[in-house]
């Protein structure tokens, strides 16, 4: 047996010796001198043997020679093994970046200073192009009268047409031709002089003659949700092309006394397209008949996301792009009326509170425009009358009321007449309530009970740019709605609840923890320099990568850091990426700092020094606006009243 074992060992040793450089005698000497020692050491390290074998397998499985070399260097170095994964990833990223730079040399030219200059040049060129476009349009439509159709200028003046007719009418002092005659016999010359006309459907029907459809190259119907198909037909028939613009979630055509029995009684009823009869607006009909359709998603009006958050979720399926404000606040203030009394369409205590708030707004925010909206015309008239009385002793109120049809005027309107208007601050009177304090609340809410009630509310909730002052006699839990309640009543109750809570579930302003390595790096460096940052600041479909809080006012953001990652690259057009987004943020009060990953990759320490220096400069220069909200809520500004306690119109 010993002889067999020796023979087997000799055979295996010979096989091993054949793989080792040198003569067999050398191997035999090595075996004789060191074999026992090697075997002893292996036995002592047997617990690490399996790990060593696994390591050799992993080294052999590395796909690239450079990666295997790096692994061997790490094994031979004194670097802590806990750092090996980061060092390995860093080496892989560095090698791949080098390969990418070799393949695309322009990447090596991207530096922050150059990119900033390019973006400024691009923005300026874009602005110049828009100015040139406007100038080109003005030049194109500025026609000399001699270049327009001259028409008939001989014979009887009653037979004059085109420019001859216009010139003849322009020198008259009396006995002018009716406008319809002018449009009929001088239409071509008028379109030559003034190619763009703005008219209502009623004006088109009453003044313009019948057309063959070639009067205008293009007709644009705005606020199309409020126009019925029959009113739009005469407008559309006069143009070669039509663009219909409107919001299907806003006011439908409104005629409180409209009846649709005429079509039903018609002898031709069977030939009428039933879809037309069922459409409530030209917008609804056009969205089915015309293609393509485009949905505009960027929301500009609200300077605070809380003003549009409710509508975005309930009416627009959270599809709007809402840019965040640079101040963390809820911009809707609720004023609950004490002892409300709603009788015959008017809530007098609510009228009084609305007027008090209007006066306080004028005192606290004289720079802001102001509008008042009530749920019905009776309430709006009552508010307007009381404000008119108060204006007798309040000069600024009188000045605002006298600015009729001006963008700075103070308007008081019922809900039905407010679409298309906007003001910095909107005071809303919800009007409805119990007939006596503590009494039952009947579920009679006027037009809100109709199928389109929620659309009316959407108009109401989206008129403000800066703030909403909600004056109400109701709490959301007082509206015990039946299972059959329509969308208008449900939206009304939910909005009251939204204002009471100060958030709307997923649509409230969000922040998150840093997730990407870049965010973690910048977040940590900012913290070590004494600044606090929030990641992913925003409301809906647009989020700022990192927003740095003002150290002296934590509710204000000092700076928005915008990177060049997925958020930047999500924009399809350079205009969006490099101009419009930043323009919108700056209009909302943000200071925007653009971060370029190439610079941060090469020199993170230098980039953080530049960023911190910018933050310190802004901290000294940025003026924090005074918060006057608490004064408004507390009523610290006294509403002026007549000195003798009576109304200026009171005969006593």
State where each predicted segment sits:
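Charged C-terminal transducer/switch regions of large nucleotide-driven machines
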Residues: 1-86
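Conserved helicase motor core of SF1/SF2 NTP-dependent helicases
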Residues: 189-192, 202-218, 226-521, 538
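Catalytic glutamate of the conserved HExxH
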Residues: 223
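C-terminal, active-site-flanking charged/polar segments
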Residues: 231-234, 238-250, 453, 457, ...
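Active-site metal-binding core of divalent-cation-utilizing nuclease and nuclease-like domains
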Residues: 525-558
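Basic, glycine-rich
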Residues: 586-652
């Amino acid at each position: 047996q010993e002889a067999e074992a020796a023979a087997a060992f000799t055979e295996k040793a010979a096989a091993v010796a054949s793989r080792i450089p040198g003569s067999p005698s050398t191997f035999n000497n090595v075996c004789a001198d060191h074999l026992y020692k090697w075997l002893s050491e292996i036995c002592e390290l047997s617990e690490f043997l399996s790990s060593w074998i696994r390591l050799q397998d992993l080294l052999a499985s590395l796909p690239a020679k450079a990666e295997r070399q790096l692994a061997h260097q790490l094994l031979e170095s004194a670097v802590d093994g806990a750092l090996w994964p980061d060092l390995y990833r860093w080496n892989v990223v560095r090698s791949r970046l080098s390969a990418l730079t070799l393949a695309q040399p322009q990447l090596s030219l991207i530096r922050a200073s150059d990119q900033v200059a390019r973006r400024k040049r691009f923005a300026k060129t874009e602005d110049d192009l828009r100015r040139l476009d406007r100038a080109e349009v003005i030049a194109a439509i500025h026609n000399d009268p001699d270049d327009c159709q001259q028409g008939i200028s001989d014979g009887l003046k009653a037979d004059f047409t085109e420019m001859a007719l216009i010139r003849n009418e322009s020198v008259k002092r009396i006995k002018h031709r009716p406008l319809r005659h002018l449009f009929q016999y001088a239409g071509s010359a008028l379109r030559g002089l003034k190619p763009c006309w703005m008219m209502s459907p009623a004006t088109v029907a009453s003044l313009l003659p019948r057309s063959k459809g070639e009067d205008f190259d293009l007709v644009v119907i705005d606020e199309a949700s409020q126009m019925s198909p029959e009113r739009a037909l005469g407008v559309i028939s006069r143009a070669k092309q039509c663009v219909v613009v409107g919001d299907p979630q806003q006011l439908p055509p409104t005629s409180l006394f409209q009846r649709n029995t005429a079509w039903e009684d018609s002898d031709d009823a069977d030939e009428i397209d039933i879809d037309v009869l069922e459409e409530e607006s030209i917008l609804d009909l056009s969205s089915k008949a015309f293609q393509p359709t485009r949905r505009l998603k960027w929301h500009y009006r609200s300077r605070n996301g809380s003003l549009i958050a409710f509508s975005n979720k309930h009416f627009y399926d959270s599809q709007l792009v809402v840019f965040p404000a640079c101040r963390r606040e809820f911009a809707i203030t609720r004023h609950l009326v004490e002892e409300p009394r709603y009788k015959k369409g008017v809530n007098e205590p609510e009228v009084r509170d609305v007027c008090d708030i209007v006066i306080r707004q004028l005192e606290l925010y004289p720079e802001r425009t102001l509008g008042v909206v009530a749920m019905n015309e009776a309430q709006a008239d009552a508010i307007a009358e009381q404000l008119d009385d108060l204006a007798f002793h309040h000069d600024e109120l009188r000045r605002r009321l006298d600015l009729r049809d001006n963008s700075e005027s103070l308007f008081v309107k019922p809900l039905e007449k407010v679409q298309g208007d906007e003001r910095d601050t909107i005071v809303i009177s919800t009007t409805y309530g119990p007939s006596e304090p503590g009494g039952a609340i009947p579920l009679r809410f006027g037009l809100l009970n109709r199928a389109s009630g929620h659309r009316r509310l959407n108009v109401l909730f989206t008129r403000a740019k800066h703030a909403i002052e909600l004056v109400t006699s109701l709490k959301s839990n007082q509206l015990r709605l039946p299972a059959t309640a329509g969308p208008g009543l449900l939206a009304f109750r939910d909005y009251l609840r939204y204002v009471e809570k100060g958030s709307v579930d997923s649509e409230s302003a969000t922040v998150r923890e840093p997730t990407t390595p870049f965010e973690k790096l910048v977040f940590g460096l900012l913290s070590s320099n004494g600044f606090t940052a929030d990641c992913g600041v925003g409301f809906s479909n647009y989020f700022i990568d990192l927003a740095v809080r003002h150290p002296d006012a934590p509710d204000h953001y000092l700076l928005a850091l915008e990177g060049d990652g997925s958020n930047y690259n999500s924009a399809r057009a350079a205009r969006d990426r490099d101009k419009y987004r930043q323009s919108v943020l700056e209009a909302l009060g943000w200071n925007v700092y653009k971060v370029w990953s190439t610079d941060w990759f090469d020199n993170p320490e230098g980039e953080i020094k530049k960023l911190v220096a910018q933050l310190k400069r802004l901290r000294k220069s940025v003026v924090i606006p005074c918060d006057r909200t608490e004064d408004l809520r507390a009523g610290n500004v006294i509403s002026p009243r007549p000195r003798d306690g009576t109304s200026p119109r009171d005969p006593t």
